[in-house]
Amino acid sequence: MFNFLRTDPTPGMTAAQAIPLVEAGEIVLIDIREPMEIAMSGKAKGALAIPTAALAMRADPRSPECLAELKSGKPVAVYCASGARSSMAKGMLARMGHEVYNIGGLAHWQQAGGAIER
């Protein structure tokens, strides 16, 4: 009945698995929340802040606005507040050709021991 509320059922990577990969520079981490959300709670250490509305422009390797980190060919992990928006972002990034994982929400990152930047 409420399938639209479900997050990605098969993320392929947990926040706990992503933490050492981000620290080692082996994966690109993207926070897709809005700037006001990030200002209120901080973001995962090492994450790029790219709100959902800017994702197509900033993450598509064919776009002149694409960030250099997203032209590297490295896998990408995305998160939001709960995992729902990052599930949608995962699909968008996959269509752009990225290997992408939804690691859920910022709370998942924190619960796994991930550091927060303010």
Where in this protein do the model-derived segments appear?
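Short, surface-exposed ligand- or partner-binding patches at beta-edge/loop junctions that are enriched
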Residues: 79
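Conserved G/P- and acidic residue-centered "switch" motifs that form tight phosphate/ATP-binding loops
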Residues: 31, 83
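Rhodanese-like catalytic fold shared by cysteine-dependent sulfurtransferases
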Residues: 1-27, 35-75, 86-118
